[in-house]
């Protein structure tokens, strides 16, 4: 959890926002997936948001569903994902690592056991995409017991009560949703919602990172100009993996070429 605090403090000092890429662990296979993560970090990623392949991803658009299918085709299991997480943590001791999950994967393990496993692997945060704030108590309590930040999604239509709950329960960062719907770079993010950012600050919420539909540097800049602490990009990155699926070296070069200008856009 503390890794997020250190990161945001460091970035604030440098007058920068955070650029956070999302990929699915094990896509397109374990070895290449680890190389992808190294390439993202080398190109300037400030933190990582990682998915564990799951058979029924509700909030994911087709791009990320395909990533899940590729990981399944490579035979990747949740247990192997945790081995990967431990390797990533060993190699990159300071970068914040977040998981984007679905509740079934947490239930399969047992809630407490799942968060204990996260702590052991060096995971900093977990966002359970299909658990609404009002049902989150067992998840967030287990998370805090194991020094894992519970992350909450702040939707564009959040009312005051929800904003207060998110501010009160969330740690690490707040996932600020650009718009409702499924993920995807085709659906470009609408401009960030300044009033939400203002309210979240007022209620002392964890720093907001804007996600969903972030696929170009100007959107990263717009998110930060509106007061977000940074931006998360997933589908646009996963699409690059898909486009270069048979050219592993080209894939890594293309990922770096995408991340560098996205990170550059976080510098005021």
From Swiss-Prot:
This is Tryptophan synthase alpha chain. InterPro entries: Aldolase_TIM, RibuloseP-bd_barrel, Trp_synthase_alpha_AS, Trp_synthase_suA. Its EC number is 4.2.1.20. Pathway: Amino-acid biosynthesis; L-tryptophan biosynthesis; L-tryptophan from chorismate: step 5/5. Belongs to the TrpA family. The alpha subunit is responsible for the aldol cleavage of indoleglycerol phosphate to indole and glyceraldehyde 3-phosphate. One of its GO terms (molecular function) is tryptophan synthase activity. Tetramer of two alpha and two beta chains. It comes from Escherichia coli (strain SMS-3-5 / SECEC). The keyword Lyase applies. The active site is at 49 (proton acceptor), 60 (proton acceptor). SUPFAM superfamilies: Ribulose-phoshate binding barrel. It catalyses: (1S,2R)-1-C-(indol-3-yl)glycerol 3-phosphate + L-serine = D-glyceraldehyde 3-phosphate + L-tryptophan + H2O. Keywords: Amino-acid biosynthesis, Aromatic amino acid biosynthesis, Lyase, Tryptophan biosynthesis. NCBIfam families: trpA. It is an enzyme of class 4 (lyase). The keyword Iron-sulfur does not apply. CDD domains: Tryptophan_synthase_alpha (cd04724). GO terms for cellular component: cytosol.
